[in-house]
Amino acid sequence: MMGGYDIMKRLVRRALQGGPDASFLFGSFIRKARYTFMIGIYDYTVVLTYCSLISASLGIIVCLHGIGHPFYGVFFLLLSGLCDTFDGRVARSKKNRTAMEKSYGIQIDSLADLVAFGILPGCIGIAMLRVSKRFSDVPHIRHVNPDDKLVLYPIALMIIVILYILAAMIRLAYFNVMEEERSHTENTARRYYTGLPVTSAALIFPTVMLIQFLTETDLTMLYFGVMVVVSFLFVSKIRVRKPGLKLILAMIAIGAVEFALLVFIHWRAGGI
């Protein structure tokens, strides 16, 4: 296989000899360098999945920065949900995908979903705990007296976060295995999911945050209670009908309304 230096030298020589234009040379170099230097897939079929992961990563950073900013974390959660809504359709639009590309798409989508809809909601909960007035008197674990029973509250809530992330991971791994087995026996599209899809977190938790802002009530405990319920639904054997186009559009509309209301409320509060 031709090395990276040889590729560059060949392209430069062709340019000096009056070969193709610079844009073609650059594109050719990128395509060849991609297979020479890097692993992975970088075409349009996975762009939205990568964007979802980037959005989730930013959400985690802002949630854990300083005292915590759960409000901004919810914005990134909604954005990740929007990317996830369309990434599958974009990937399937490429008709000549290889088996490796399809398998890669499934795996990378699940990994991104674990970060976006597993870890990020947990970080939002941690940020809510930090800014909650109800828990302002609860000491930090590293500063607490072992005999102080108040420390049990944050420990219990951290356990809920860990179990939630674990449930999301189990759900995604199970889905990948079942989807691979189904692809060998069925050619039709899936009609039902077993267990609640993890992407539902993109609408469930922003709703809790929206209610908190509308009612001006500290709903930190409710948020963690919802995490417990959702964790169970992730790994339950309930059958959830796969949403059709109308339901997908309805969920997009709900997410857009939640996003707009959160922006408006935060703007009225002088946060933007």
Can you say where each PLM-predicted feature lies in the sequence?
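Juxtamembrane transmembrane-helix termini
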Residues: 62-65, 126-136, 174-181, 215, ...
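Membrane-embedded alpha-helical segments that form the functional core of polytopic membrane enzymes
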Residues: 51-107, 157-165, 226
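Interhelical loop and helix-boundary elements at the membrane-water interface
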Residues: 11, 28-53, 92-115, 156, ...
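Core segments of transmembrane alpha-helices
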Residues: 51-56, 113-122, 196-209, 227
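Multi-pass membrane catalytic core of lipid/isoprenoid biosynthesis enzymes
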Residues: 47-50, 93-172, 209
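Membrane-embedded alpha-helical transmembrane segments of multi-pass integral membrane proteins
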Residues: 55-58, 87, 119, 167-170, ...
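C-terminal membrane-associated helical module and adjoining short loops/tails
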Residues: 3-27, 177-272
